Amino acid sequence: MKVTFSLMQKASKQIDKFALYVPKSGVFPKGFKVATQATGVKKNGNLDLGIIRNVNTSRPSSAAAVFTTNKFKAAPVLVSKEVLEVTGGENVDAIVVNSGCANAVTGEVGLKDAREIAGVANQNLGKQNATLVMSTGVIGQRLSMDKIVPALSQQFETNAFKDDFESWLNLARAISTTDTFPKLISSNFKLANGTEYTLTGIAKGAGMICPNMATLLGFIVTDLPITPSALQKMLRSATDRSFNCISVDGDMSTNDTISMLANGAVDTAVIDENSQDFVQVQTQVTEFAQRLAQLVVRDGEGSTKFVTVNVKNALNFKDAKIIAESISNSMLVKTALYGQDANWGRILCAIGYAKLDNLQSLDDKKINVSFVATDNSEPKELKLIVDGVPQLDIDEARASELLAQQDLEVLVDLGTGSEECQFWTCDLTHEYVTINGDYRS
């Protein structure tokens, strides 16, 4: 299907994502404060430095993180990994993030710069190994330390840390690069004993997003008391079903980091892997992380559609995820969705070349593929393949209606088991090429 001028016009119309996805208020965990500043690293003068600080002293904090699998790990990734290895995740009280420069592929000098930033924060906290560092932006350039270090010191010296909504929103702004809106969510939850706690999440990312994370930074903070090992297990599981289940363009970056801090400001028993509350909190953190990860896809560079790829009835979760990932990363599928073309052949092709662990997960006589409406319109499901047989009499008018929607679900029923994976992706447009062609300029 050729992309018509009318389709290009439609894609060029800007969706007001800020109005749709940015909150106007929020609830935030006890004992955390944040600060931001425009240091001048970003050419446009926008906020480019952010700090999260734990100010609760009632008990030790815990930290956890999941990092990129890219072989060329950026300096801040290596330094943050060192901090967690040395401390075991105990008594980490701050995260310092800069945007505009990734401090990636910068060699020993990059490591020195990342350690210096952490050292400035540690000195002001009065502790060693108490700070995680993150960077995002252009790869291969050294940090402007003459701008970042004085600005970081100033935040501590002037006690610029606050805990109000606007300050948290500014933190989300400070870590943005090609993002069209700041990504901030927060929610209250209750434990079985009635104790209320809060999760706040911030993320950045709009391009170089694919499984095992990409140019993606995110952090979740909570006032629950959780042991470091339980927090790491919780975050790892949540990440596998959230940030590792999203794709914008299939590119994996050098800087991905998802971190989590728990400061124990809520007065309740410390949660470990054997606690009765562990499974409940893990489920809540996973669902929360999925909400945050979905915002990254909704901000996919140049995208016009948010697509849920739901693979169900697989032999195991891993194979369901492999197939969902294969569909989500297919350039041909993504461009067909942009062109509003019900090209089921591209979906089937992506399923067929998925590198499954167990070939019995896929039976070409059992597979079903459908488009599913995400609104209340009927018929809700448009079947494209039934028990391995392509449907030659597809209702093209209904297909056009579904593909014109901003939210769409692709449902794949493998019919070989009972496991399921949801993956989130977007279409690929002319605007994506424009944004990335002009990135450094």
Swiss-Prot record:
Subcellular location, principal: mitochondrion
PTM statement from Swiss-Prot or TrEMBL: The alpha and beta chains are autoproteolytically processed from a single precursor protein within the mitochondrion.
Annotated Gene Ontology cellular component terms: mitochondrial matrix
Residues the UniProt record annotates as site (Cleavage): A214, T215
Record has Cell membrane as a keyword: no
EC number: 2.3.1.35, 2.3.1.1
Quaternary structure and partners: Heterodimer of an alpha and a beta chain.
Function: Catalyzes two activities which are involved in the cyclic version of arginine biosynthesis: the synthesis of acetylglutamate from glutamate and acetyl-CoA, and of ornithine by transacetylation between acetylornithine and glutamate.
HAMAP family noted in UniProt: ArgJ
Family the UniProt entry places it in: Belongs to the ArgJ family.
Leftover remarks: This protein may be expected to contain an N-terminal transit peptide but none has been predicted.
Protein name stated in the entry: Arginine biosynthesis bifunctional protein ArgJ, mitochondrial
Natural source organism: Kluyveromyces lactis (strain ATCC 8585 / CBS 2359 / DSM 70799 / NBRC 1267 / NRRL Y-1140 / WM37)
